[in-house]
Amino acid sequence: MKSAQAAPSSSSLALEFVRVTELAAIAAAKWIGKGEAKLADKAAVDAMRKQFNTIDFRGEIVIGEGAKDESHELYIGEKLGTGKGGLVRDIAVDPLECTDSVANGRPNALTVIATGPEGSLYHAADSYMEKIAVGRAASEVIDIDAPVADNIRKVAKALGKDVSEITVAILDRERHEKLIADVRAAGARVQLFSDGDVATAIATCFRDDPIDILMGIGGSSEAVLAAAALRCLRGEILCRWKPKDDKHKKRLHDAGITDFSTILRAQDLARGDDVSFTATGVVTGPLVEGVTVIHEAVTTHSVVMSTAPRAIRFIKTRHIN
């Protein structure tokens, strides 16, 4: 009598997804420092899509390069994979997070994939969200409605630190002037970063990283990608819609989102017990090192996380031409 076969999971395709982000990173890295953000992004998109379509699975983009009429590749609703095999996945991608960092040779650029079972990843309309993210030790103490100082004090207590030792990472934007002032008034440190709140949110989960909290307003797509990783690491992210203008409000209304006060947690953005997150560095940042080329060998550094099994792997790959 044959034993029942286990249902396929993301872990069975982990290395396949790593290969996707690796090739996208290598393609984008050729444009580092050349001032061509759009060409760097296109190189990553082309490489990512091409490799996805060699994998035996059935995937659908739920977060990608925009609507079908805005993008010809990796658009929302696009089907990926060969269609063979029993694995059906929601896919969220950022083929090149921090395109400007690549164009200008600044740190912290990644190629990113998050996956989950069909219907598991939040279909986030392209807008902005207010966010607060922390690692596992402080996952139950944050409150997006609480004053900044209260959240800092609670996180400090959860981490066994003095408030003066807490570092809050904030995207370096004019809209965050008051937030920066509030963090400093509370007695904590501020670490500003130019781009890349996915990697920065994840950094809160590693005790050897100086970042303790991510706060501020950033992209909704990045919130879903970060949530997938934080689910794997038992961290937490709290988000609330913060559309910047009437155009963004209309976009959300068209997507069926009318209550901007709803608080969304990691579990709301990346549901289920089979979530995965894969990223490869293009330019070195807080999560992984970037692409390096020595003679004829290209080296990539990637991170792979999953909730089933709950694990994190750092992968260094040397690609021999």
Put a short name on every predicted segment.
Residues 68-70, 175, 194-201:
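Short acidic loop-to-helix transition motifs that present clustered carboxylates
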Residues 1-92, 153, 157, 273, ...:
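N-terminal subdomain of lithium-sensitive/metallo-dependent phosphomonoesterases centered on the IMPase/IPPase/PAP
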Residues 112-192, 285-286, 290-292, 298-320:
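Acidic beta-strand-loop-alpha-helix segment within the catalytic core
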Residues 183-190, 197-203, 207-211:
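Glycine-rich ThDP/TPP pyrophosphate-binding loop and its adjacent helix/strand module
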Residues 73-75, 103-106, 124-127, 178-184, ...:
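Short acidic, glycine/serine/threonine-rich loops at helix termini
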Residues 2-7, 13, 203-221, 225-321:
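Oxyanion/phosphate-interacting regions
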Residues 85-97, 101-120:
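DPxDG-like acidic metal-binding loop motif
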